Amino acid sequence: MAAKVDLGKSPAEAPFKHWPIKGPEVSVEYRDDGCILLRSKHAVGPEPRSIAHLFVTQASTFPERPFLNQRLAGRGPWRSITYGEALRAARGIAQYLIERNLSAEDGVMVLSSNSIEHALVALGCYLSGVPVIPISPAFSLLTGDHGRLRHCFNATRPRIIFAQSGSTFAGALATLRDLDATLTFVTAQDHGPDSLVLDALIETEPTGAVASALERVGPNTVAKYLFTSGSTGMPKAVPQTHGMMTALVAGLEGLNLPESEDPSVVRRTLEWMPWSHISAGNVGFNGVIASGGTVFLDDGKPMPGLFEITMRNLREVQPVVFGSAPIAFGMLAAAMENDVELRQAFFKNMQYMAYGGATLSNDIYDRLQALAVLETGQRIPLTTMYGATETQGISMTHWVTERVGLIGLPLPGLVMKLVPNGSKLEVRVKGATVMPGYLGDPEKTAAAFDQEGFYKLGDAVRFVDDKDPTQGLVFDGRVVEDFKLDSGTWVSVGVLRPAIVAACSPNVLDAIITGQDQPFVGALLWPSAAALEQFRHSDGGPAHEALKAAIRANLAQYNATAKGSSRRIERFAILREPPSFAIGEMTDKGYVNQRLALECRASAVASLYQNPPPADVVIVQ
């Protein structure tokens, strides 16, 4: 097993670092139909008219403060743009869009990943009232037929296409050119013969038309279209109004204590998660603007060969806040257990950490806190926000807790409804952060809401303590991922997966849970890089056999205390190929799409249930 840090004493004895935020206060209404309604007792904070207005205010307040930082090509030094510079550039882009007669009925599609230029295009759209449409770069780069790119284009029909590099996105640009010959293409570098240079848009002299356009931007103005992950079909286009986004800003502001605003501390973050999704594109991006913070764009990812870049950036940035998917925290814990300098840099300024997209395992949480105590003498608050593309963030763990797996309590201004669904409680929500409906799809819109207008998220939750709702809600699995064994016993994938990862830590990075209509639960496991390295140098037999033996021992120990067939892992196999970004097994938010992974690994799944099993399948017992 890979080495762990020896603290000498339990980190649970250490205090938490002070986190100036209001604690949990919730009103609970129990209805005769079995539904439970939850509301925060905290009032919402001040709400800006739009994100565009908010950015103008912050740029006027902090004109010289760095807003965005990005490395120059070739892992060079950081280049930076201030709030004031970003506003001047965005106004130029807005003027160009106005001169081209673009309106709220049109759009600017962004094909490429996070960049300073991407942000400027988005802000220019906000100021002019033209929707921006950021899509996953994978739709352009990792699929040969560009099926999802075509789908997103046809759903929104933008008039302008932006890509960071004309050469990198040449294939996607050609596909779109064939779809619509009237499109305007804009690139920041490696320009093609028929593309405009973004600098030309930025240098457009703004007139009073920009201010007039901003006056027309309000809560009901569509700021952007985001696409769902498409785990159950083609991605759906979700309008993101300014009111949806500012309602989230106001809800979060309602939780801040007066002492939260320390002018000497600038919220400095390192961001790799994509702006084509809610977490980074709305919660993170708008949150940084609201706090007057500074973003460093991370060109690394939680993938072998790329996480080393993230570690280098963490050493330099020394962030105040760090948020990511659980997979990144697992890799980070393993790295810091063997790298003192990284640990020192990571915790030097850290005020709190945040995770989302999937459940963090208890083991990773314990290891992170052990490292924090070793470095600072304190535990660091770790929060999570729960929501969806259709809802923004709707709940948050806004208090210090020693548990993981919580989704917190509803944010101020929202109503959460818990609906009995078998033995579970299904989550639904109503409020200003929720979408008005899918673009051009009234049937899916109607199916997404119940008769009272609550959006149905498809997840299940339970109270930490039924007698004390202020302890919050625990994620209890995704209803659409749960399945039955052939005995009729339900298996909760969202609960079981992190439990298995924790039981096998640090040998396993992630897991696919199997067993629908089968006699037992199985698992396909991705080994961690640390485990592969450790067992490559192990004594005795081949490294792969030693790793299988170690994981078998982990699972045997786990099974000894697991209650019932729905919690036990009877067989497993180790996956040699990492989850694929190209086909969507691994989303660009950094979590595994269980449904798609099961389809893509169908032969491996089937092998778990062969009798006798093949050599690569391990029986735990």
Enumerate the language-model features and the residues they cover.
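Conserved structural elements of the adenylate-forming
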Residues: L87-I93, T204-G208, P219, V238-E261
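Structural core segment of the AMP-binding/adenylate-forming
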Residues: A2-W19, L127-L201
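Conserved AMP-binding/adenylate-forming core of the ANL superfamily
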Residues: A43, E64, L68-L120, S140-R150, ...
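Conserved ATP-binding/catalytic segment of the ANL
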Residues: L425-L485, V617-I619
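Conserved AMP-binding/adenylation subdomain of ANL enzymes
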Residues: T246-R268, W275-E341
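Conserved AMP-binding A3 loop
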Residues: R79-G84, L214-R216, A223-A250
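Gly/Ser/Thr-rich phosphate-binding loop
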Residues: S291-G293, M311, V320-G323, A333-V404, ...
